[in-house]
């Protein structure tokens, strides 16, 4: 108890640290700015970046120093051009260098007080007028069509006041950061409030180290790093706050990017984790704040202007209520079992904890095992996604000694539960909890001793909408591949009808393609997609016009694109939005290194292009092999279902139903992509990083999983010299990787460059239901708890590991065991 009070005192002391910036409001603006820059990726590299750096040195900084304290600007604020603000942003994120450059050239630190961001929608007329007077030959907004690199180089070399800091490299280091903090939960008030509090705790550790003359490289998680960056964007406040706290300006070292085991980032994160937990008695790793893996490869390097093609989205749509599909919310959970007390003699060192949910859902419906930190001396963490309902149930299991036959069941010493709803509804009260839970003894357990208690640490992300997953089930009893759900209800159409069912096996709608050969009133070569709802209503959902499919009374259309390479889209869905369909898994669905057994050619990714997302945003994924679609947004549900049904039906018939392209054509176009992917997988199998898997649906149950596996469990990889493994299985299940020594963890960190996602050495991944073996490895291990159901995260067991990346794109999670 005294130790717990000491932890509380330390935390309260940390919260007394004074920050002269409203970090919550500033972080929201920071995220908005990063989002805007990401929509203008010409700022990341190339001639436009070189021109932006010149304009920053030659125009913006002189304007700022000339007018920032001038009375002529007192009536309004300066608004920098976007390109100049981005370079200024990256310069300030090296606070020591920025301060020294400002002092050298201007005699003082140039602050952002009196400056408004270009993305806030503020009037720029005053600043534009000042700019034109100072720089009549240089337009206020960067002219992308008039960039002369030779001229820029010549003018830059002639500047008297120009930083020698390598701003090109600084931009390249900062560019990936937005991906790490771009998930929707990051922008919520409660997540940012806790991030601010954790940032103060982070600074408190640094202060302690300086007072004790300890040289430690502290590495932040991404929630802390976001707030740290935000603080640095206010140069004078950051300088004053840091000098007051530690006597100097705290350096932000973002130059280290080597995430290998034993390197600076790896050891720094391990030591930061240990110091945090020793000082505050709470967990450092946090749901939704861990490394997501590398930024996905873009589907295009040129922004797509789609506004000309977009139809009016406000037009009345009588198809909106044709199908009923309840929205489901999802949270990411990070779980760790810290300790056990009052454990009876004879059980020490033999116990573990099985955890599950009282209300299993489509995202998490299995029982998983975790070791206890105090018993084994190694950190093991589970991250997974689930619906924010019911309770987490924990059972303390005592394993049998090795001399007792394996057939004997492990002894259940008791159970306890923790309500998810208590913390998330009706108002989110907190996103982290760590407490002792007293166990209720199981039947037959001794009751004459003190009650056993477990110390459980759980963190959550705020609930967000879960993607909708729908499956195409053929009504033919002999169907193979896509019929992994029982037929629900009676077939209202012909025997070749396709039932669309959700994850609960509830029928949503029944579809059938009807053509002129069926008789009736259809013209020659005309085809229709007919739909029958659960209420019995029959509607024409799509009509083939001879060159494209017209969907939902011409509100949408599905067209084939003449793709010259496998990297280009094959189809497009046009309507109130513009969606292009690419072969393979792209962007958020990009396959990771434990997903090799499912061919990337089995999938098609739906990518929306808009003014807000000129480089594309994933909105859905179609599994062509098993016939399913995941839709991230409601507007895509009906046009997405109809389009996926047409593509799945047409491509299997060799293109005879309206498209020339076939599955064979797609595979031929993608041979080079497949060859490159195979080469990368061979290389990555022997590297030190494992990243995450993406998939959408499961094959036939029990495929490759071993005993008790429901078919939803995904890959099982047991590696001898492997490290951790992330996962991203669209809310289903991820990889299981058990590794021994020579493993490294994955912190998060400064500028988005630190942290590790670790790869299994000598291991190969796989799709759902696959079992992968590495060197000196076999089978599944015992991490499944007797049944690998959907919704499990990855299991990674490693020695001397640090940090943990919580699932790619927020979809699933990891189980990481680290020293």
UniProtKB/Swiss-Prot annotation:
GO annotation terms (biological process): abscisic acid-activated signaling pathway; cellular response to osmotic stress; regulation of abscisic acid-activated signaling pathway
Keyword Cell inner membrane in annotation: no
Pfam families with a match to the protein in the record: C2_GRDP, GRDP-like, GRDP_C
Inducing or repressing factors: Up-regulated upon salt, osmotic, glucose or exogenous abscisic acid treatment.
TM stretches of this protein: none
Signal sequence interval, chain numbering: none
Keyword Acetylation: no
Entry GO CC: plasma membrane
Keywords: Abscisic acid signaling pathway, Stress response
Purpose of the protein: Plays a regulatory role in abscisic acid (ABA) signaling and tolerance to abiotic stress during germination. May be involved in the regulation of the ABI transcriptional factors.
Protein name per UniProt: Glycine-rich domain-containing protein 1
